[in-house]
């Protein structure tokens, strides 16, 4: 059966993360049978990492605040998590299903495909987002 996405519900969750006035900084999109639907959401990145278990595949849209004291900016990441115990067929479908997620999640600085929990570490993601941002005008850098 072909995978579908609940666009309205996923778009509402996506917009919640994009809203600077919202405390929600991440949302997951998970499979409910053959339909991608919004999953959990929260204000603590560590709680997001707990969703990424070895038997799960999911997509996540995450907001990070970057910059220095003079200039704070929101940067967004699209993360595809594929757990170690996910079957080969499901792994393959995840790549094609991501196109459905990208119909909703259209604005992000960097995309990640991760199956190793070490790569989910907040410092690693922040570092990659900083590299994707181009020139570094941080006053503390030399």
From Swiss-Prot:
Modified sites of kind N6-acetyllysine: 102
Query: Which molecular function term from Gene Ontology is one that the record holds?
Result: actin binding
Leader sequence residues = none
- Say which domain of life the source belongs to: Eukaryota
SUPFAM superfamilies associated with the record: Actin depolymerizing proteins
Segments carrying the region annotation (Flexible and important for F-actin binding) are 66-75
Q: Name one GO cellular component term.
A: site of polarized growth
What UniProt keywords apply to this chain's record, in alphabetical order?
Acetylation, Actin-binding, Chaperone, Cytoplasm, Cytoskeleton, Nucleus, Phosphoprotein
Q: Which Gene3D superfamilies match?
A: Severin (3.40.20.10)
An example of a Pfam family matching this protein is Cofilin_ADF
Localization terms from the record: Cytoplasm; Cytoplasm, Cytoskeleton; Nucleus
Q: Name one GO biological process term.
A: defense response to fungus
**N-acetylalanine modifications at:** 2
Which sequence positions carry the modification called Phosphoserine? 23, 141
Q: List, for all copies, the residue spans of the domain called ADF-H.
A: 2-130
InterPro entries named in the record: ADF-H, ADF-H/Gelsolin-like_dom_sf
What does the UniProt function comment say about this protein? Binds to F-actin in a calcium-independent manner. Has no direct effect on actin depolymerization. Acts as a chaperone for ALOX5 (5LO), influencing both its stability and activity in leukotrienes synthesis.
Question: Whom does it interact with, and what assembly results?
Answer: Interacts with 5-lipoxygenase (ALOX5/5LO) in a calcium-independent manner. Binds to F-actin with a stoichiometry of 1:2.
Query: Which family does the record assign?
Result: Belongs to the actin-binding proteins ADF family. Coactosin subfamily.
Database matches in PANTHER family: COACTOSIN-LIKE PROTEIN, CORTACTIN AND DREBRIN
Name by which UniProt lists this protein: Coactosin-like protein
Q: By which gene is this protein encoded?
A: Cotl1
């Amino acid at each position: 059966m072909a995978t579908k996405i609940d666009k309205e519900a996923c778009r509402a969750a996506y917009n919640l993360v994009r809203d600077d006035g919202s405390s929600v900084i991440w949302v997951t999109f998970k499979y409910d049978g053959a339909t991608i639907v919004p999953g959990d959401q929260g204000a603590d990145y560590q709680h997001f990492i707990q969703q990424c278990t070895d038997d799960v595949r999911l997509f996540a849209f995450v907001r990070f605040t970057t910059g220095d004291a003079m200039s704070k900016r929101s940067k967004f990441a699209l993360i595809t998590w594929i757990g170690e115990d996910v079957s080969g067929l499901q792994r393959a479908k995840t790549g094609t299903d991501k196109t459905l997620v990208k119909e909703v999640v259209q604005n992000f600085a960097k995309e990640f495909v991760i199956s190793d929990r070490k790569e989910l570490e907040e410092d690693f993601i922040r570092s990659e987002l900083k590299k994707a941002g181009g020139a570094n005008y941080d006053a503390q850098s030399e």
